[in-house]
UniProtKB/Swiss-Prot annotation:
It comes from the Eukaryota. The keyword Hydrolase does not apply. The gene is Defa22. Residues 20-58 form a propeptide. May have microbicidal activities. It comes from Mus musculus (Mouse). SUPFAM superfamilies: Defensin-like. Disulfide bonds join C64-C89, C66-C81, C71-C88. InterPro entries: Alpha-defensin, Alpha-defensin_N, Beta/alpha-defensin_C. PANTHER family: ALPHA-DEFENSIN 1, ALPHA-DEFENSIN 1-RELATED. Its main location: secreted. Residues 25-40 have a biased composition (Acidic residues). Belongs to the alpha-defensin family. Residues 22-41 are annotated as: Disordered. This is Alpha-defensin 22.
Length: 93
């Protein structure tokens, strides 16, 4: 039941992030990002047997990256990475 509530909250949050337009500040519009600057490699670990099985399932079905400001089109928000980064995932094809 707790998993269902957590997954529902994540889905609703991801939906809200995708539907809300993000307002750029003057500072953000004046700075240029270097290609690949947003992409960061991340290692995620879960404790216990159940967490290990969940991690294996997620790693097979999803490709996840850490992004600076928002997830790209086709990606969903799946939590945070180290620091201010967002964990954005998409399904494997």
């Amino acid at each position: 039941m707790k998993k269902l509530v957590l997954l529902s909250a994540l889905v609703l949050l991801a939906y809200q992030v995708q539907t809300d337009p993000i307002q750029n500040t003057d500072e953000e519009t004046n700075t240029e990002e270097q290609p690949g600057e947003e992409d960061q490699a991340v290692s995620v670990s879960f404790g216990g047997q159940e967490g290990s099985a969940l991690h294996e399932k997620l790693s097979r079905d999803l490709i996840c990256l850490c992004r600076k400001r928002r997830c790209n089109r086709g990606e969903l928000f799946y939590g945070t990475c180290a620091g201010p980064f967002l964990r954005c995932c998409r399904r494997r094809r």
